[in-house]
């Protein structure tokens, strides 16, 4: 199945939006198929602050939130003047079209300033969550459609480093997870919310055996198709769980992400789905490959392979043939997706801290470190660096790819890389 349809097929069936429309855009944090892959071709390989740049838009602050792109619009979560705001940007000009206030409060916690969750869009509406628990919907002209305060409704978030999960947009619904425990005794839970009116379709608690900081999860959910059914995949609290998307009921579970019962095993890297392959990272080890369709405890039945070098923060990417993994220290592996065996391993990229995640497109891997240097690698079984492109600016977010351009958000600017579009 072509990459652009690998996960988007289910979205199309669910929502009526064409797969081509999803493919050419970057509608949520992990792109058109929610797995970091884009079918785009002829993408830039080399650039600098002065070369191969369509435009540069100054920004007021750093953020872990990734830009999302649909057609002629780009949307950003922005921390500014003590609050969190949604910016809509003209893609051709690189200028703000409108700004909307989301929430007061931009508490700074290392790599968190309450703007971390990335927005999502279906080309008609845009939905955005903040680290303060505000969830809002807007149309493309900036009209607010509805708003909710998740903390007010269900209690304060209790994560050690603040709430950072992005909503998952799938068909007519948003899936929002709140997995916490370090600073609260309240249960973790998952919500399915109507994108049209903001009403809760279901809410289910998600139990955990994890202790202290280990219940905390900063991941974003994923959807996997198994036969004719759809399963929502959640990682965190030492476990991988699969849920019925229609009811939220937990179908299966593997309490296998923290075998040593470490008390500080929060999870940041999100689950990744390609076809019926689920990649479930943990903080350090293990990283699991699983198959869906199980019932009950699947730790001994549905784990395909286990890899003992986890990414910690960056989310892996897989094209179904290879799984590419990089940890927060810039050490990279390529694994056989079917067996988990190393194709190559412990290859070191430029020394730095890596908080962003891979984008895989045009036969290339793009990864940006916290110093603003993007390494471009050839995808495939051979480790080959094609280029290193440096913006020399603090960077936490991941590259976004759309219609021949790459968008990278640094602390001081949003950069559009590639040929300018007609204005």
Spans of model-derived segments:
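Bacterial N-terminal signal peptides
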Residues: 6-17
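N-terminal secretory signal peptides that target proteins for export/translocation
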Residues: 1-2
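Noncatalytic, solvent-exposed loop/strand surfaces
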Residues: 20-423
């Amino acid at each position: 199945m072509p990459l652009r349809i690998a996960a988007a097929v289910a979205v199309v069936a669910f929502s009526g939006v064409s797969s081509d429309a999803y493919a050419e855009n970057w509608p949520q944090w992990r792109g058109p198929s929610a797995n970091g892959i884009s079918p785009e071709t002829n993408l830039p390989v080399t650039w600098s602050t002065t070369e191969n740049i369509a435009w540069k838009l100054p920004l007021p602050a750093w953020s872990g939130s990734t830009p999302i792109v649909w057609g002629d619009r780009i949307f950003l979560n922005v921390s500014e003047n003590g609050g969190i705001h949604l910016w809509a940007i003209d893609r051709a000009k690189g200028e703000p079209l409108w700004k909307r206030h989301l929430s007061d409060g931009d508490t700074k916690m290392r790599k968190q300033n309450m703007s971390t969750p990335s927005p999502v869009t279906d080309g008609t509406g845009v939905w955005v969550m903040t680290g303060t628990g505000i969830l809002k919907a807007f149309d493309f002209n900036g009209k607010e459609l509805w708003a909710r305060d998740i903390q007010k409704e269900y209690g304060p978030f209790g994560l050690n480093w603040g709430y950072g999960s992005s909503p998952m947009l799938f068909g007519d619904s948003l899936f929002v997870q709140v997995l916490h425990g370090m600073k609260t005794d309240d249960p973790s839970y998952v919500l399915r919310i109507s994108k049209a009116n903001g009403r809760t379709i279901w809410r289910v608690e998600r139990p955990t055996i994890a202790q202290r900081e280990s219940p905390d999860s900063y991941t974003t959910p994923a959807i996997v198709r198994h036969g004719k059914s759809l399963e929502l995949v959640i990682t965190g609290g030492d476990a991988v769980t699969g849920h019925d998307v229609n009811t939220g009921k937990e179908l299966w579970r593997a309490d296998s992400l923290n075998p040593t019962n470490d008390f500080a095993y929060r999870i940041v890297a999100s689950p990744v789905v390609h076809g019926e392959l689920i990649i479930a990272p943990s903080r350090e080890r293990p990283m699991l490959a699983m198959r869906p369709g199980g019932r009950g405890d699947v730790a001994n039945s549905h784990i395909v392979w286990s890899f003992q070098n986890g990414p910690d923060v960056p989310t892996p990417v897989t094209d179904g043939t290879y799984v590419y993994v990089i940890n927060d220290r810039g050490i990279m592996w390529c694994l056989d997706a079917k067996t988990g065996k190393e194709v190559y391993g412990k290859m070191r990229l430029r020394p730095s801290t890596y908080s962003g995640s891979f984008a895989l497109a045009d036969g290339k891997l793009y990864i940006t470190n916290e110093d603003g240097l993007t390494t471009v690698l050839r995808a495939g079984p051979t480790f080959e660096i094609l280029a290193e492109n440096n913006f020399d600016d603090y960077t936490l977010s991941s590259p976004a790819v759309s219609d021949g351009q790459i968008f990278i958000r640094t602390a001081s600017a949003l950069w559009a890389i590639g040929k300018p579009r007609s204005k």
